[in-house]
Amino acid sequence: YAFEESFRGGVNVATGFTTDNRDSSNFRYADIIAGRGPGGPPEVRVFRLLDAPNLPNGLPQFFYNQAASFLAYAPDVNFGVNVASRFRPGEPTDDIVTGPEAGGPHVRIWNGQVIGDLQSFVPTLQSEYMAFDPTTHVTGVFVGGGQRLSATE
């Protein structure tokens, strides 16, 4: 379960390279980014793939551990959180982009800082903005990711 088993508000999911997760052959694995749906605090969790032995039939098995958990908005905002990842050229990790499912068009971009062994994501609010006029757009906003380019690219 991405959140406690009793939570029934749904989960918004994205993938991204928020930790520098590589195997012994330098293959990089994407992390799972989960935004809590409506009915709870605006929590985002990041799950990192762990190395695991293959099953007896030779098929791979996958285990994930929680690498991060943070509130994308004030604790009393319980509309749910949409999530995406954004690639940053030249950086080891992606950003996480969040948008509320309801309550306004408040987009936030979280910088993918990592610590120690590059297995934990430490969120730092990089920027935020209103995607639309918040006085007229009172529903939420879906977010998407991709590669951040400069004006000269």
PLM region descriptions:
Residues Y1-A2, E43-N65, S69, V107-Q126:
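Beta-propeller blade repeat segments, especially FG-GAP/WD-type strand-to-loop junctions
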Residues Y1-T15, A68-S85, E128-L149:
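Repeat-based blade/solenoid architectures
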Residues E5, T18, L49-A52, P75, ...:
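Disulfide-stabilized cysteine-rich extracellular repeat microdomains
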Residues E5-S6, N12, D31-R36, N54, ...:
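Compositionally biased, low-complexity repeat tracts
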Residues V11, T19-S25, A30, L50-P56, ...:
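Intrinsic-disorder/low-complexity regions
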Residues V11-S25, A30-I33, V81-T98, V141-E153:
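Beta-propeller blade termini
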Residues I32-G35, V46, F70, R88, ...:
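Terminal helix-to-tail segments of small alpha-helical proteins
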Residues G37-P41, E101-P105:
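Short glycine/acidic-enriched loop and turn motifs that connect beta-strands
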